[in-house]
Amino acid sequence: MTIQWFPGHMAKARRQVTEKLKLIDIVYELVDARIPQSSRNPMIDEIIVNKPRIVLLNKVDKADPRVTQQWLDYYKEQGIYALAIDAQAGKGMKQIVSSSKELLQEKFDRMRAKGVKKPRAIRAMIVGIPNVGKSTLINRLASKKIAKTGDRPGVTQAQQWIKVGNELELLDTPGILWPKFEDETVGYKLATTGAIKDTILNMQDVAVYALRFLTSHYPEQLKQRYNLNEIPEDIVELFDAIGSRRGCLMGGGMVDYDKTAELVLREIRTDKIGTFTFDDPSEAEQPL
């Protein structure tokens, strides 16, 4: 399923999440560790209001560990629980349950004080934009394949409760929430990491953004991957250097810029060049 976000779809997604909030104790806000700010829903704070929340930075294996720690420090300063996880490999799964119990300790203490000897399982809902790994996280927590997974945005379609041991019940929310497109750069970050379909933006433009970012922040990885002694300042020359070295050519030996763009983005997404984080906590648009 491909989600094209229009006002009607946004209103429906918000309504679905809001309705289910009445049923749950805690929200797991799933973001991409490479773009923790850009992969947040723009209205998430409004939508979940006063519900306890844990921010889960997924795909941490693809992110710059130094910047991931900066993001964790940032969330701590904001008074927000945050965990760095890798749902694909199962990293951080136990901490999700233990952190949830810690956050909800007072609530369950009150239940015991009222005579509830054995409080029920924690009820949680995962929210996030498409393709941040929601289904993968559900499958990992449940220790079996329940939710359909894939690399295409918006692959989850049905709504279901998932029991995770005796301590946690997960609500899988269909349609998830829409990404924000507040400015061009956010769109490029979403496209670079594969959070939105490649047909939404021009892939050459996305690759230009990605290469300029890597040139500025991760030049050594870029030089090593493409055997460059120096990185050309001119972006066309950089495309030419990469395309010619990797055989992205048209007839007559001319570099095929479309193929070069596809190559660069594919190698970023599959970690062939290295691990990167495109959002910096110092540039966070607003406190959580």
Curated annotation (Swiss-Prot):
Keyword vocabulary terms for this entry: Cytoplasm, GTP-binding, Hydrolase, Nucleotide-binding, Ribosome biogenesis, RNA-binding
Signal sequence span is none
GO cellular component terms, alphabetically, are: cytoplasm
Which positions form S-S bridges?
Answer: none
Question: What biological process terms from GO does the record include?
Answer: ribosome biogenesis; translation
Residues involved in GTP binding: N58, K59, V60, D61, N131, V132, G133, K134, S135, T136, G175
What SUPFAM superfamilies does the entry give? P-loop containing nucleoside triphosphate hydrolases (SSF52540)
CDD domains found in the cross-reference section: YlqF (cd01856)
Question: What range(s) does the CP-type G domain occupy?
Answer: 14-179
Which is one GO molecular function term here?
GTP binding
Spans traversing the lipid bilayer: none
Tell me where in or outside the cell this protein is found.
Answer: Cytoplasm
PANTHER family named in the record: MITOCHONDRIAL RIBOSOME-ASSOCIATED GTPASE 1
Q: What is the purpose of this protein? A: Essential protein that is required for a late step of 50S ribosomal subunit assembly. Has GTPase activity that is stimulated by interaction with the immature 50S ribosome subunit. Binds to the 23S rRNA. Required for the association of ribosomal proteins rplP and rpmA with the large subunit.
State the similarity comment. Belongs to the TRAFAC class YlqF/YawG GTPase family. MTG1 subfamily.
Describe its assembly: Interacts with ctc. Interacts with the immature 50S ribosome subunit. 2 molecules of rbgA bind to one 50S subunit.
Name of the protein:
Ribosome biogenesis GTPase A
Which species expresses this protein natively? Priestia megaterium (strain DSM 319 / IMG 1521) (Bacillus megaterium)
